[in-house]
């Protein structure tokens, strides 16, 4: 490979100009569209926030927005609810998030950390009422849901953020700057892998892969519902089934198609975010996934998904491949790169860039010893939640807003869709359909239990 010939100073100026131009337009849109009750709200004024999902990730998210006023707590588990209420005793308490929206006048913003299959249901009423929303990843449980929620947020002009905290880290932003300024030349392929192997597997495989549960089939026997858990509310729009501890508490539910979407959409929300952002991706042309024979109810522990993306402006077509569990990219298997457990590898005409959450390296290192990267041009932020809170008050754009995050969520779900159908899909993003696979329609949209609708 030849030494990169890019002029960092020129590239930095050009990309900074493009970035600031697009950011200014976006910021103007958000400022003009900010709900009236927050226009001109000072940074020192606190938001009134409703917490939907107070345990697990919800507890962490609550702590991350605790600089504001926590006025509502909601969780299907009374134990989680009461534990959170010890810290926020003045907050109103609910077990059914649908009811809190009946008395929402004092709420400025909502943080949603429920199980994946109820994300859209907890988020949509907030958007329709003009509340700002922070939602855990993945944004929704399905492809059509993701598009619907993203469009609703755009129409309502509310400030949104999906919970992909790595998007706010300096390392991710630096990688995007390096890729966009041509540090390794045009990128024509990228590989993303995570070592987590949770899902359909034997007890022995689960032990080796450090999975907290082993699931091969839906349990036939029921178990007593834990005290304080409102199981029917946890099920929400999902088909009715008796309680068993292979479903709850989280993150056990994420292995089951009725409640989650496996590692592909969970960790894929974090790791696929980096190539999605750096390569300016949106909708793939085709998707083809490989793995063990699909189970009708349980997500796989290991699989891969290959995406073909077309040219984007002056960027060439690119192939992006996802690997999870025991499956790894060829560069890793052949030991041509450092053996990181998780990573993103960009392969360019002039070199490669390997990154994870906290670090990155240009390869081969000998070619980049004297390399000086571009000056930073993507604004740094104090944190993912902090960025959202500030945006709620000022109208500034957020990095993982629902327009961006919705498209990322769609792409991740498409990997699962191709896997479950066992076909290479030709994707029509306008009509949300696979041109060559009409049977995909049943999985692109969703059927909800009686009493639940969007």
Predicted regions and their residues:
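Glycine-enriched catalytic-core subsegment of oxygenase/oxidase enzymes
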Residues: 60, 66-67, 74, 78-80, ...
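Conserved SAM-binding strand-loop segment of SAM-dependent methyltransferases
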Residues: 92-96
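Beta-strand-loop-alpha-helix segment that lines the small-molecule cofactor/substrate pocket
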Residues: 116, 120-168, 175, 182
């Amino acid at each position: 490979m030849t030494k990169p010939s890019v002029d960092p100073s020129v590239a930095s100026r050009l990309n900074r100009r493009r970035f600031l131009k697009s950011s200014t337009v976006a910021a103007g849109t958000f400022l003009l569209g900010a709900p009236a009750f927050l226009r001109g709200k000072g940074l020192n004024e606190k938001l009134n926030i409703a917490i939907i999902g107070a345990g697990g990730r919800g507890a962490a998210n609550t702590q991350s927005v605790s600089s504001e006023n926590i006025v509502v707590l909601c969780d299907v588990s009374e134990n989680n609810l009461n534990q959170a209420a010890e810290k926020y005793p003045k907050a109103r308490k609910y077990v059914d998030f649908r009811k809190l929206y009946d008395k929402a006048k004092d709420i400025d913003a909502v943080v949603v950390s429920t199980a994946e299959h109820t994300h859209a249901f907890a988020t949509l009423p907030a958007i329709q009422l003009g509340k700002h929303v922070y939602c855990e990843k993945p944004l929704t449980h399905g492809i059509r849901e993701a598009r619907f929620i993203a469009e609703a947020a755009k129409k309502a002009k509310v400030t949104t953020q999906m919970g992909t905290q790595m998007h706010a880290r300096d390392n991710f932003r630096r990688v995007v700057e390096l890729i966009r300024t041509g540090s390794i030349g045009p990128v024509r392929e990228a590989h993303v892998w995570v070592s987590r192997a949770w899902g359909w597997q034997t007890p022995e495989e689960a032990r080796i892969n450090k999975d907290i549960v082993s699931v091969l089939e839906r349990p036939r026997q029921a178990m007593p519902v834990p005290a304080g858990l409102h199981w029917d509310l946890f099920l929400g729009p999902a088909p009715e089934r008796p309680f068993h501890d292979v479903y709850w508490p989280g993150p056990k539910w994420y292995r089951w198609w009725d409640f989650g979407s496996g590692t592909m959409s969970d960790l894929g929300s974090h790791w696929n975010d980096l190539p999605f952002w750096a390569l300016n991706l949106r909708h793939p042309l085709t998707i083809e996934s490989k793995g063990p024979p699909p189970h009708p109810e349980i997500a796989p522990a290991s699989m891969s998904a290959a995406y073909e993306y077309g040219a984007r402006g002056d960027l060439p077509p690119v192939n992006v491949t996802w690997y999870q569990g025991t499956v790894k990219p060829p560069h890793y298997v052949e030991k041509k790169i450092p053996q990181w457990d998780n990573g993103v590898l960009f392969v360019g005409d002039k070199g490669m860039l390997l990154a994870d959450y906290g670090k990155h390296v240009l390869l081969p290192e000998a070619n980049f010893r004297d390399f000086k990267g571009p000056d930073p041009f993507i604004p740094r932020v104090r944190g993912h939640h902090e960025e959202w809170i500030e945006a709620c008050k000022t109208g500034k754009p957020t990095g993982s807003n629902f327009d961006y995050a919705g498209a990322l969520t769609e792409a991740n779900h498409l990997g699962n869709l191709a896997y479950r159908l066992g076909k290479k899909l030709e994707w029509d993003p306008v009509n949300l359909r696979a041109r060559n696979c009409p049977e995909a329609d049943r999985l692109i949209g969703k059927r909800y239990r009686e009493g639940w609708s969007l």
